[in-house]
Amino acid sequence: MPNPKKPKIAFAHLGCDKNRVDTEHMIGLLAAAGYGVGTDETEADYVIVNTCSFIQAAREESVRTLVELAEANKKIVITGCLAQHFQGELLAELPEAVAVVGSGDYQHIVEVIERVERGERVQQISAVPTYIADETVPRYRTTPAPVAYLRIAEGCDYRCAFCIIPHLRGNQRSRSLESIVSEAHQLAAEGVQEIIIVSQITTNYGLDRYGQPQLATLIRALGEVDVPWIRLHYAYPTGLTPEVIAAMRETPNILPYLDLPLQHSHPEVLRAMNRPWQAGVNDRLIERLRQELPEAVVRTTFIVGFPGETESQFEHLCQFVQRHEFDHVGVFTYSPEEGTAAYDLPHQIPEEIKRARRDRLMELQQPIAQRKNAAEVGKIVPVLIEQENPQTGEFIGRSPRFAPEVDGVVYVKGAATLGTIVPVEITAADIYDLYGIIPASVRFYP
């Protein structure tokens, strides 16, 4: 129970699912220390804002949130990547900021609040983040009850020319295999139906700790955990080895779903990005994946408008997308990030051209996505039920082809229980979502 003598704390979460795990650990630590924690900023003595600083748009969202809270005269604790990136500027510009906490220092959040309560203005920032929480650190999940993110590593050893993450999050540090499997068993005991494996580069898991990547070994170990769906995010092209693909194929609870950010298709652009660039590398990977795991659902992301990207190179990317027909595609316009190799490159692309290229690529993808979804009509597929509309009685869930937050959903009619996986007959589809009914003869998916 919260200690009424301690201040009330509200959280505002921004950013990626790795950042969400940090938020959940901070909530868990504060709750374990007796603090009342919630989302009601009006009642809170302090608002902790866990920020993102990955690209300009994310920084702008973080700053807007901070300014709104400052205008409401809230005492703000700024955590996460924006704090890591701009700690001095934030303290100088926001008198309401009583503390800044770096991306590798969230484990100190209770001590930070205690110091603030004593009148100190706290700057808790490690110059080089090295921390990663394990299964022993308290955590309060903020996702829908049947879903949990499981972070297997933090930081990144690669230096993609456009990416500031290594500066914000440090180099890769992997958890032990035993620690990860232990947390997976904890989540299973809590009734979790879907675990989403995350890190900066999931396919590099274990390289720093064991001397070589151990994702295939981890996949097989997670196959012993009583969770029906386990999903992998953030694969790196060269890390998707035959051993990893075989482990996915042979482990029943690993969904045949891959989040595989490719960023571009043209070798010259990929080389400038400091990505795997040898001619045809991504084509060969997709072809091998389709051959060895033909049922795989593939999500990818691309960056358009990278410095020097020509019209012909962009056309190469368009043809690549049309040729491979990915299930889900996200497109970002290049965001120049100070401190990255690409920031000072010549031939920066005007914003209006970047936006036009993004829009064209998404327009090319839409009929592909429509066809992929339409192919589901008439099938009976498992759907994890996550929400209910009390007005209509309709449920909202996801099939294995949809990851939370980034992909579509399935709108379901029929009798179901929240947090369960049920069979749904797909009756209709649009570009992003599916629609279906629960057959009367079967209530729950085995």
From Swiss-Prot:
Subcellular location: Cytoplasm
One Pfam family recorded for the sequence: TRAM_2
GO molecular-function term, one example from the UniProt record: protein methylthiotransferase activity
GO biological process: tRNA modification
Keywords: 4Fe-4S, Cytoplasm, Iron, Iron-sulfur, Metal-binding, S-adenosyl-L-methionine, Transferase
Radical SAM core domain residues: 142-371
Record note on cofactor: Binds 2 [4Fe-4S] clusters. One cluster is coordinated with 3 cysteines and an exchangeable S-adenosyl-L-methionine.
GO cellular component, one term: cytosol
InterPro entries, sorted: Elp3/MiaA/NifB-like_rSAM (IPR006638), Methylthiotransferase (IPR005839), Methylthiotransferase_CS (IPR020612), Methylthiotransferase_N (IPR013848), Methylthiotransferase_N_sf (IPR038135), NA-bd_OB-fold (IPR012340), Ribosomal_uS12_MeSTrfase_RimO (IPR005840), rSAM (IPR007197)
Binding residues for [4Fe-4S] cluster 1: C16, C52, C81
Catalytic activity entry: L-aspartate(89)-[ribosomal protein uS12]-hydrogen + (sulfur carrier)-SH + AH2 + 2 S-adenosyl-L-methionine = 3-methylsulfanyl-L-aspartate(89)-[ribosomal protein uS12]-hydrogen + (sulfur carrier)-H + 5'-deoxyadenosine + L-methionine + A + S-adenosyl-L-homocysteine + 2 H(+)
EC numbers for this chain: 2.8.4.4
Domain TRAM positions: 374-440
PROSITE patterns in alphabetical order: MTTASE_N, MTTASE_RADICAL, RADICAL_SAM, TRAM
Domain MTTase N-terminal: 7-118
Family, per entry: Belongs to the methylthiotransferase family. RimO subfamily.
Protein name per its UniProtKB record: Ribosomal protein uS12 methylthiotransferase RimO
